[in-house]
Amino acid sequence: MPVRRGHVAPQNTFLDTIIRKFEGQSRKFIIANARVENCAVIYCNDGFCELCGYSRAEVMQRPCTCDFLHGPRTQRRAAAQIAQALLGAEERKVEIAFYRKDGSCFLCLVDVVPVKNEDGAVIMFILNFEVVMEKDMVGSPAHDTNHRGPSTSWLASGRAKTFRLKLPALLALTARESPMRTGSTGSPGAPGAVVVDVDLTPAAPSSESLALDEVSAMDNHVAGLGPAEERRALVGPASASPVASIPGPHPSPRAQSLNPDASGSSCSLARTRSRESCASVRRASSADDIEAMRAGALPLPPRHASTGAMHPLRSGLLNSTSDSDLVRYRTISKIPQITLNFVDLKGDPFLASPTSDREIIAPKIKERTHNVTEKVTQVLSLGADVLPEYKLQAPRIHRWTILHYSPFKAVWDWLILLLVIYTAVFTPYSAAFLLKETEDGSQAPDCGYACQPLAVVDLLVDIMFIVDILINFRTTYVNANEEVVSHPGRIAVHYFKGWFLIDMVAAIPFDLLIFGSGSEELIGLLKTARLLRLVRVARKLDRYSEYGAAVLFLLMCTFALIAHWLACIWYAIGNMEQPHMDSHIGWLHNLGDQIGKPYNSSGLGGPSIKDKYVTALYFTFSSLTSVGFGNVSPNTNSEKIFSICVMLIGSLMYASIFGNVSAIIQRLYSGTARYHTQMLRVREFIRFHQIPNPLRQRLEEYFQHAWSYTNGIDMNAVLKGFPECLQADICLHLNRSLLQHCKPFRGATKGCLRALAMKFKTTHAPPGDTLVHAGDLLTALYFISRGSIEILRGDVVVAILGKNDIFGEPLNLYARPGKSNGDVRALTYCDLHKIHRDDLLEVLDMYPEFSDHFWSSLEITFNLRDTNMIPGSPSSAELESGFNRQRKRKLSFRRRTDKDTEQPGEVSALGQGPARVGPGPSCRGQPGGPWGESPSSGPSSPESSEDEGPGRSSSPLRLVPFSSPRPPGDSPGGEPLTEDGEKSSDTCNPLSGAFSGVSNIFSFWGDSRGRQYQELPRCPAPAPSLLNIPLSSPGRRSRGDVESRLDALQRQLNRLETRLSADMATVLQLLQRQMTLVPPAYSAVTTPGPGPTSTSPLLPVGPVPTLTLDSLSQVSQFVAFEELPAGAPELPQDGPTRRLSLPGQLGALTSQPLHRHGSDPGS
């Protein structure tokens, strides 16, 4: 695979940097967005949650003024100082008394620090909290919870005496109060002076309690002294985006009760003077600047409004806490300043005003100066680092540092590789062959060892290796977190722990150090220490170990290198035995005799070096491959022992390497083949769709990183080959960190955890990727396990989430998934666990005993559901019933009597039917009502229409049967029904609309002797309108279509009225005689086939008076309207008039069985 480049994509490491700096010091801090209302909290660490007792979900989106921590002993002056720092986007350090969730009070030191983006604009605030002491004073009220109203005990005590906290920082300024009091105007209305009352009575409002609108007005007054542009810049942020004048999402009842005149603000804040304003303290960006400031600290005179930005005593260093300010240091010109004098006119021996003026500079001026406390600088400045900026930052590379994947480093590595190969070849050769020649005096006696050409090359190689060691001290590396480390100190430590010792030993020129000592054997042995450089080959060539061709080439080179080393050893053995051997039987003597260059009696002469090396290499290759011919044979015992070792090595190498070359290549090449296949597909996709270069780079980088993260393993494909029990165990192991440390999953049974683990999916996101877009359906719940993300609404950051945070929507509150109200974008490389809502609900349904615990302990850090898209945020029943109503609200009638209630013994037949609404025994066997029609073909029930109001008129005719009294819990048919009733009526509605009144006439025919229908009194109200169709609502038919339908209905009603008037006498006779007769065939549209006998229950009725033509005319209208098809614009106008044919003797029919006519819709 290619070299590991690490995380080289630009990342927003703001949150990680803050956590790294603060968490190591056990800091407690929150991060607030300066661009949203009330400077809402978008992040809080675990230390702050432990300090205040609130969970992260309870703190998120609250005002960063921490009004929910206020209590009876919270100083309003201190709260005003925090608000002033937030309004002025300045750094401040305030001591204030806060209350925990359990009611305990503690004195806290708050550091307010602004954070800038790359443009220099303040977009966030960091508030660091440091506990000074636990407040336990005499007469202190009992522990009081912050979320309830103030008790009468401490309210009464607060009115009795004034509470004054002796702040050490403010007491130190008492000596400087006199010049300010004498030099200031004594009236509250003096220009530039603001009266601040020190009385801290918590109950009654006082002049000390200045709301934010008063502060804005005060800014207006002072800003009038400067240019118009400065005045607008000063007043704009305070008036447009107030910090405390608008209640936050979690208003504190106690804070509102403490300050009733704050215009709805959750806490009454005022701009007051902080203790750090007494002298101008220069901003330091590192610890070195702090020391320099300490050494050169001098008392400064009081400032005035005319003091400019380039004061002679002001330091030339830019007061900066971010990289952008340091870059713009030389471009800053003179900055106009506006000052306010905060004067205390009440004589107070404990609290005093400072002697200097407080500078308030317009927040729009980016290159402004601030007064920075030394504590803030120590907290935020560690070494040479400065406060990070909230922006995408590429990995910071230290100066004079070489990237490990840079082209220079790649060329240098190849050069070092060639030098290592040279060392591996020539070091054994020179130790075995050349030293003996030097010892024999083949070279000139006055020419030293340095005159040899190979010695000069060895010297150059040694120098190159020493230079490589120095380069390794400046080369970046990738740590375990896939981060590129460029800090020289960390690089040196990493190199010392790794390969430094081996590289150092291999780079020592031993032959030069012991040159002239006369021990050539020792030199030859020490020269072999350079073979340690072969470890470099293993390191450099490891990245090519997955390529089949490279592996084959490396195996061949390894085999040749081992043969070369063995040849040098073979020559060394023969050369060592040759002078001490009386009988010339060694392989060197045999070689000299064979080629005609024998050794003389003095041992000189013999074959040349070339002949010796080639013969030795020939013998080792033939022995390693077991194909030796015997022309070079071992004769002495030493030679035979070495030959045995060579044969053993050769057999192992031949069997393990050459015999399995194909298997090795296939095994090593399988992963690489998959990688290159996938990469080829990605590149073909990029080429085919012409993806632009920035997006192409992101695709390739994500693929490479995802491959290194998963190693090309498809987890789903792997798990499919195992049984479900083993899959659950594997998933439980992979998600063990989430299931063990996340609070909602604690207490779950092993089976529940296994079921949940099977449903979780892991998502890996690079920086800059958007996980959820605004408007997307929220189909899953997300748990962050690594990295940080931001949530944006438009371009405004509303939350920054980190490890162990949860975002999504509360699934138990909504039956249908909602839509996201913002974009979720990754700031760094993130790992998230997500579970789909259907899967989660399915598991919780299987384990109901765990469901209640899960929903009660689940704290979603940020709720992404957009409640504005659905007006009123309806419940699931409203959503489902509303969805059904949209399909059925085609046509509706106004059928309601003047009386809202009916008699106790009556059941409405034209309303919803019986008082019990919903499916019952009488409607389960009827698919679409009593006449077999589908629910969507006829008009909807009165409850299914939202258009009908209290003033709708009613039908003049109502036919109701007498029945038993209703149960107490049932509602009458004329009263509005609940949402459940609406939902049930949509499912099964046998007596739907006005049509049900006519259907009841034929439903109760049979052996019901003595049962009569009665006519209700007619309503004096005007005739009702038949249709209630809002033409202007979306999705309705056009006006012309509705008018054409009305004309067709009118014609149909006229025909039906004519038919019914002709058949009325016969119908009344049938009803009075209570005989089973065939109902009249009045349908003029379609004649259905014969159907099953009706099984509707028969209800007793009372006597019915004679029906009039007008009353039955109303019934005919409803019948005609019910028979109208849903999609037919016109109805048939002509057709034969069908009349009822009665037998001659009606009395004989009473004993005959019921035979329904084929045209009867109820058949």
UniProtKB/Swiss-Prot annotation:
Keywords: Cell membrane, Coiled coil, Glycoprotein, Ion channel, Ion transport, Membrane, Methylation, Phosphoprotein, Potassium, Potassium channel, Potassium transport, Transmembrane, Transmembrane helix, Transport, Voltage-gated channel
Molecular-function annotations in GO: delayed rectifier potassium channel activity; identical protein binding; inward rectifier potassium channel activity; monoatomic ion channel activity; potassium channel activity; protein homodimerization activity; protein-containing complex binding; scaffold protein binding
InterPro entries noted in UniProt: cNMP-bd_dom (IPR000595), cNMP-bd_dom_sf (IPR018490), Ion_trans_dom (IPR005821), K_chnl_volt-dep_EAG/ELK/ERG (IPR003938), K_chnl_volt-dep_ERG (IPR003967), KCNH_animal-type (IPR050818), PAC (IPR001610), PAS (IPR000014)
Keyword Ion transport: yes
Residues annotated with Omega-N-methylarginine modification: 1018
Reaction equations catalysed: K(+)(in) = K(+)(out)
Coiled-coil residues: 1039-1066
Ranges facing Extracellular side: 427-452, 519-522, 571-613, 635-640
Positions carrying Phosphoserine: 239, 245, 285-286, 322, 353, 873, 876, 1141
Glycosylation sites noted in the Swiss-Prot or TrEMBL record: 600
Gene Ontology CC entries for this record: cell surface; inward rectifier potassium channel complex; perinuclear region of cytoplasm; plasma membrane; voltage-gated potassium channel complex
The name this protein goes by in its record: Voltage-gated inwardly rectifying potassium channel KCNH2
Source organism of this protein record: Rattus norvegicus
